[in-house]
UniProtKB/Swiss-Prot annotation:
GO terms for molecular function: pimelyl-[acyl-carrier protein] methyl ester esterase activity. The gene is bioH. Belongs to the AB hydrolase superfamily. Carboxylesterase BioH family. It comes from Aeromonas salmonicida (strain A449). This is Pimeloyl-[acyl-carrier protein] methyl ester esterase. Monomer. Substrate binds at residues 20, 82-83, 143-147, 235. The lineage of its organism: Bacteria, Pseudomonadati, Pseudomonadota, Gammaproteobacteria, Aeromonadales. It comes from the Bacteria. It is an enzyme of class 3 (hydrolase).
Length: 254
């Protein structure tokens, strides 16, 4: 298993993990601004972009975190968007000594709605699984639309996401299927109570995948962490509000 990483820039090491269905090129819209201050590491998660997934791989969250740990600098700031936020959180729990800080973007320790927990409705994830079996490209298009839903610039956001996605090889079906499984099954709410690293959580108020009702619950659950909500952003705030997003990251990382 070989994890592909695009590296450039100078300064403290900042590793960026993309979300479901995407690849590391999704950060290209803000990469040059960040690279003026940080040594960037844009990772393609296994099965996405230029990181081929071997048949029979155990696509669990601990396994994903282990694969990413292999290509991490000795110590870094780690930023994960959406599903990438789950991977980053797992890494922060299992190898905290490798990280200076954790940043999760439009991510939740528990994506699927459960008793007294707002999240993605189970029927939505079931629907994506069914669509995936029939036409995975159409499924990704649908997911792009949901990610931009609510944004003032939804069409532009989708166009940007589609552009970056097309820069690298299409994702593998096995990774897409397993990734949906992680979004449905993973629940790190209790584990993250023990996290002692500096932790920034960034959200879009209009995000339909990480509903605003969950943000207050997370603020209450993790009082030592910091949260920033972009009022007019949806699930991809670094696409819709790039300048503001870069400023938030720079303020936190330093």
């Amino acid at each position: 298993m070989s994890v592909s990483v695009e590296r450039f820039g100078q300064g403290p090491d900042l590793v960026l993990l993309h979300g479901w269905g995407m690849n590391g090129a999704v950060w290209h819209g803000i990469a040059q601004q960040l690279a003026a201050h940080y040594r960037l590491h844009l990772v393609d998660l296994p099965g996405f972009g230029n990181s081929p997934l071997r048949e029979g791989s155990d696509y669990s969250l601990p396994w994903l975190a282990e694969q990413i740990a292999i290509v991490l600098p000795q110590k870094c700031h780690l930023l994960g968007w959406s599903l990438g936020g789950l991977v980053a959180s797992q890494l922060a729990l299992t190898q905290p000594e490798r990280l200076h800080s954790l940043i999760t973007v439009a991510s939740s320790p528990c994506f699927m709605a459960r008793d007294e927990w707002p999240g993605i409705a189970p029927k939505v994830l079931t629907g994506f699984n069914q669509m995936l079996a029939g036409d995975f490209r159409q499924t990704i298009e649908r997911f792009l639309a949901i990610q931009a839903m609510g944004s003032e610039h939804a069409r532009d956001d989708i166009r940007q996401l589609r552009h970056w996605l097309a820069e690298r090889p299409a994702p593998q079906f096995a990774a897409l299927e397993a990734g949906l499984g992680l979004l449905a099954d993973v629940d790190l709410r209790d584990e993250l109570l023990q996290l002692s690293l500096p932790w920034l959580r960034v959200y879009g108020r209009l995000d339909s995948l990480v509903p605003k009702a969950s943000i207050a619950l997370l603020d209450e659950r993790y009082p030592a962490s910091h949260s920033v909500v972009l009022e007019k952003a949806s699930h991809a705030p670094f696409i819709s509000h790039p300048q503001q997003f870069v400023e938030i990251v720079r303020y936190f990382v330093g």
